[in-house]
Curated annotation (Swiss-Prot):
GO terms for cellular component: cell surface; extracellular region; phosphopyruvate hydratase complex. Its EC number is 4.2.1.11. CDD domains: enolase. Its cofactor is Mg(2+). The active site is at E204 (proton donor), K336 (proton acceptor). It comes from the Bacteria. Keywords: Cytoplasm, Glycolysis, Lyase, Magnesium, Metal-binding, Secreted. This is Enolase. Mg(2+) binds at D241, E284, D311. Its main location: cytoplasm. Catalyzes the reversible conversion of 2-phosphoglycerate (2-PG) into phosphoenolpyruvate (PEP). It is essential for the degradation of carbohydrates via glycolysis. Binds a second Mg(2+) ion via substrate during catalysis. InterPro entries: Enolase, Enolase-like_C_sf, Enolase-like_N, Enolase_C, Enolase_CS, Enolase_N.
Length: 424
């Protein structure tokens, strides 16, 4: 009854107006699943390949080749299979692709099918996606990392680091956490406007003011947290995404906005200095994706008291994560479904992290859609943290709103991760 009888791929647009893949899956019993695939702006060199068409159509960014793969080869290979056999289906698609990075069929094609099948199977089972994937113990609502100031590749301003986020650790519930974040977000907007800064929002809904440095951005955030009625380092903490690979040149970190160039050791010390001065509890991609020595230095310096998240470093890849675990590098993995390209491999990466006592942070991409799958996956995996943008733009709010619904559905079973994520 849960056999796959039809798969329909199509080209839709993401939050940046670029094409992406959407997939519908129909099962024999009438159950249906739909998934849309996200896309990143700053991408790691080791990510699975997002297949684009090239040529002039959509300035080369069309995804008709990936859609053709969904409607053709992939459907031929998995049509008739039982949607409940997620691992077998994902394995079949990966083997059909035949490359190490999904470059033939495209990770965007494979992922769209993988997620849509999980949704259809959940509907067939009469379960919400988080319960279908996570089982009876899926009840932990994640602390949001809310991106309120943008720099780097996500903004046209001098700030070198890509994201400055607030984490409402002191909230009692996820719903309260969203409210607290919204209050700080709107307070920050007023503060920026009062001092003559631009308050337009970027790809992920955060502001992109013309501030000169990371400390300048952090100072603004501290003032906004306090003015909104909260205590930095108690109610609200801060997280950074440095996206350091973007400014790692010839073995050095070139901070153009701050007008200085740092050796890896000095970069690690600079981040440690910021973490000592401000209530920073998480730093993502503090060092470049292949600067393993720099990562080791940073981990040795502050890994016992600060979450050090590997995004470009690990690219949701269990093999790279295992290398990092062996080397004692970082202590957390950012989980982006399209970096690895299937649901099964995503869940494997989270499990690998948890077994090694590394944390996992479920994450969006800068190019998103109204699809809210990652909200369900954050709860399904009990990862306790989610990174899904600011308190603006419906493509970001779709995830927060879904988490609010999930918390309501769980009722007394629901638990907000809150202070449990703090280290040291």
């Amino acid at each position: 009854m849960t056999a796959i009888i039809d798969i329909i791929g199509r080209e839709i647009l993401d939050s940046r107006g670029n094409p992406t893949v959407e997939v519908d899956v129909h099962l024999e019993d009438g159950s249906f699943g739909r998934a849309a695939v996200p896309s990143g702006a700053s991408t790691g060199a080791h990510e699975a390949v997002e297949l684009r068409d090239g040529g002039t159509r959509y300035l080369g960014k069309g995804v008709e080749r990936a859609v053709d793969a969904v409607n053709g080869e992939i459907f031929e290979a998995i049509g008739g299979l039982d949607a409940e056999n997620q691992i077998q289906i994902d394995k079949t698609m990966i083997e059909l692709d035949g490359t190490s990075n999904k470059s033939r069929l495209g990770a965007n094609a494979i992922l769209g099918v993988s997620l849509a099948i999980a949704k259809a199977a959940a509907e067939a089972a009469g379960l919400p996606l988080y319960r279908y994937v996570g089982g009876p113990n899926a009840h932990l609502l994640p602390v949001p990392m809310m991106n309120i100031i943008n720099g780097g590749a996500h903004a046209d301003n001098p700030i070198d680091f890509q994201e400055f986020m607030i984490m409402p650790v002191g909230a009692e519930t996820l719903k309260d956490a969203v409210r607290m974040g919204s209050e700080v977000f709107h307070t920050l907007k007023k503060q920026l406007a009062a001092e003559g800064h631009n308050t337009n929002v970027g790809d992920e809904g955060g502001f992109a003011p013309g501030l000169a440095s990371a400390p300048a951005a952090l100072d603004f955030i501290m003032k906004s947290i306090e003015k909104a009625g909260y205590k930095p380092g108690e109610d609200m903490y801060v997280a950074l995404d440095c996206a350091s690979t973007e400014f790692f040149k010839d073995g050095k970190y070139v901070l153009e906005g701050e007008g200085r160039t740092l050796e890896p050791g000095a970069m690690a010390e600079y981040l440690a200095e910021l973490a000592g001065k401000y209530p920073i509890i998480s730093i993502e991609d503090g060092m470049a994706e292949d600067d393993w020595d720099g990562w080791k230095a940073l981990t040795d310096l502050i890994g016992n008291k600060c979450q050090l998240v590997g995004d470009d470093l690990f690219v949701t890849n269990s093999a790279r994560l295992r290398d990092g675990i062996k080397m004692g590098v970082a202590n957390s993995i950012l989980v982006k479904v399209n970096q690895i390209g299937s649901l099964s491999e995503t869940l494997d990466a989270v499990e690998t992290a948890h077994k090694a006592r590394y944390t996992a942070v479920m994450s969006h991409r800068s190019g998103e859609t109204e699809d809210s799958t990652i909200a369900d996956l954050a709860v399904a995996t009990n990862c306790g943290q989610i990174k899904t943008g600011s308190l603006a733009r419906s493509d970001r709010l779709a995830k927060y709103n879904q988490l609010i619904r999930i918390e309501e559905q769980l009722g007394l079973q629901a638990a907000y991760a809150g202070r449990s994520i703090l280290r040291g």
